[in-house]
């Protein structure tokens, strides 16, 4: 149809569709709950668009009626997706775990409010357990769930970091107030900073409705101004003491800035953690080796070199500091599996190549197991290349292929031969490991 002669109703519907399309990324990425302000805003916009679509006059014309129907269906699809994101069972699971963390903070964070820095083992263990459970919430690669899990995890990890930083400091300071008149003021500021830690944690966890990030930021900035105004008369030990307290305040201000920017930035980005960076560097090299192996025309000559380097990567992962952080533990666990499955792929390929070079008489059941191992080798090559989620056709196909191999192994009768029994057992374990790896790959981990 000539754009110049396009019916006004069609033009209006196209305009509404453009507006709906523009808001789609916000709907797809919505990671909150149905009582969030942003949920209500998106719901209101989409509902308004539906009313706008409904009010377009079709004049009884079929093409306009079809265009209006398509526009309404697209808008209704986004409304449904918004509702599903907010009410997804795993989103509710994330929120329930976060509520447990809130209850723990309310119950155990009193020492911070009183100006001390005594945190019970029960609190530390509770936070560790909560973070670990969050890392195991399945997202199925869904953007909204990954975002919700990431946001919740990083908030709680920030709380853990604030607490651990406070616990490990234990300086020889504060100084005696007899040393210099300024020391009394620095000591009182340090007490205020300890209290501010408790307030910050309560803010991060959403358990203090009487305080705001902005107000606490002003209070902390005021404390820095008070410290800057002190005359320390060139006394090195007092100047160092003041510097330590200022550094503590600046750390707390950093968390406040991140919390205020949380909706628009990668707040508390665990990806900047030095242990995570080490893990990422290992994974980067592992992917390079994997691509080289999967693309090689004649890979056998690469096997030994690749396997030696991969075993070295496992050694590097063993040296990564976990820092008592379950997120780092989970990241390392996944990285170890990624490297180990590639070593398994190489071992299997090598074994199959050797069998071709040195054929021998085999018991029929044993031969059947080897044929299945050959199938598993091909499937594992595909799984290593797979990068989708559980809804992908390729995921379903690979899962079905692996299940068929397990059924085929179950049907093999070793006829009492021990060697065949052991081979079948090993093949079953391999198929199960590939299935587990496929499951892990489809639930992409984010820091």
From Swiss-Prot:
GO biological process: Golgi organization; negative regulation of neuron projection development; negative regulation of oxidative stress-induced intrinsic apoptotic signaling pathway; negative regulation of proteasomal ubiquitin-dependent protein catabolic process; negative regulation of protein refolding; negative regulation of protein ubiquitination; protein stabilization; regulation of inclusion body assembly
Domain of life: Eukaryota
KW Chaperone (keyword) present: yes
Cellular-component GO terms for this entry: cytosol; inclusion body; junctional membrane complex; mitochondrion; nucleus; perinuclear region of cytoplasm
GO MF terms held by the record: protein kinase binding; protein-folding chaperone binding; ubiquitin ligase inhibitor activity; ubiquitin protein ligase binding
Signal keyword on record: no
Domain BAG, first and last residues per copy: 9-86, 95-167, 182-260, 275-350, 365-442
Record-linked InterPro entries: BAG_chaperone_regulator, BAG_dom_sf, BAG_domain
Oligomer status and interactors: Binds to the ATPase domain of HSP/HSP70 chaperones. Binds PRKN. Interacts with HSPA8. Interacts with JPH2.
Free-text comment on this protein's domains from its UniProt entry: The fifth BAG domain is responsible for the interaction with HSP70 nucleotide-binding domain.
Function: Co-chaperone for HSP/HSP70 proteins. It functions as a nucleotide-exchange factor promoting the release of ADP from HSP70, thereby activating HSP70-mediated protein refolding. Has an essential role in maintaining proteostasis at junctional membrane complexes (JMC), where it may function as a scaffold between the HSPA8 chaperone and JMC proteins enabling correct, HSPA8-dependent JMC protein folding. Inhibits both auto-ubiquitination of PRKN and ubiquitination of target proteins by PRKN.
Annotated protein name in UniProt: BAG family molecular chaperone regulator 5
Organism, as annotated: Mus musculus
């Amino acid at each position: 149809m000539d754009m110049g002669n396009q019916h006004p109703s069609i033009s209006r519907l196209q305009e509404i569709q453009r507006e709906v399309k523009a808001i789609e990324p916000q709907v797809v990425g919505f990671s909150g709950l149905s009582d969030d302000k942003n949920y209500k805003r998106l719901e209101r916009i989409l509902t308004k668009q539906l009313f706008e679509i409904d009010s377009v006059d079709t004049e009884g014309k079929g093409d306009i009626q079809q265009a209006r129907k398509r526009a309404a269906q697209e808008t209704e699809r986004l409304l449904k997706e918004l509702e599903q994101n907010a009410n997804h069972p795993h989103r509710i699971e994330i929120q329930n775990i976060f509520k447990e963390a809130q209850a723990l903070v309310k119950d155990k964070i009193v020492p911070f409010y009183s100006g001390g820095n005594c945190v019970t083992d029960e609190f530390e263990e509770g936070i560790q357990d909560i973070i670990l459970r969050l890392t195991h919430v399945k997202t199925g690669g869904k953007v909204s769930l990954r975002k919700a899990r990431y946001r919740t995890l990083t908030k709680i990890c920030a709380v853990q970091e604030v607490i651990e930083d406070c616990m490990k400091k234990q300086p020889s300071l504060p100084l005696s107030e007899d040393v210099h008149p300024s020391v009394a003021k620095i000591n009182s500021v340090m007490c205020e900073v300890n209290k501010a830690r408790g307030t910050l944690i309560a803010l991060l966890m959403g358990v203090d409705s009487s305080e705001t990030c902005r107000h606490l930021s002003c209070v902390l900035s005021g404390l820095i101004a008070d410290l800057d105004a002190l005359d320390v008369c060139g006394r090195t030990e007092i100047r160092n003491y003041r510097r330590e307290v200022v550094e503590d305040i600046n750390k707390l201000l950093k968390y406040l800035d991140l919390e205020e920017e949380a909706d628009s930035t990668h707040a508390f980005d665990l990806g900047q953690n030095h242990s995570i960076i080490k893990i990422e560097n290992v994974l980067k090299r592992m992917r390079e080796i994997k691509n080289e192996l999967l693309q090689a025309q004649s890979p056998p000559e690469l096997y030994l070199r690749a396997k030696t380097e991969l075993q070295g990567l496992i050694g590097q992962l063993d040296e990564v500091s976990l820092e008592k952080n379950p997120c780092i533990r989970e990241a390392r666990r996944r990285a170890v599996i990624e490297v180990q499955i590639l070593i398994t792929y190489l071992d299997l390929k090598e074994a199959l190549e050797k069998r071709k070079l040195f054929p021998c008489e085999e018991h029929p059941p044993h031969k059947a197991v080897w044929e299945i191992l050959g199938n598993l080798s091909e499937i594992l090559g595909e799984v290593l290349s797979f990068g989708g989620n559980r809804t992908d056709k390729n995921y379903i196909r690979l899962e079905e292929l692996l299940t068929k191999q397990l059924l085929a192994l179950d049907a093999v009768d070793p006829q009492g031969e021990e060697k065949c029994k052991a081979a079948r057992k090993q093949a079953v374990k391999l198929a199960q490991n590939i299935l587990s790896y496929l499951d892990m790959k489809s639930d992409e981990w984010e820091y």
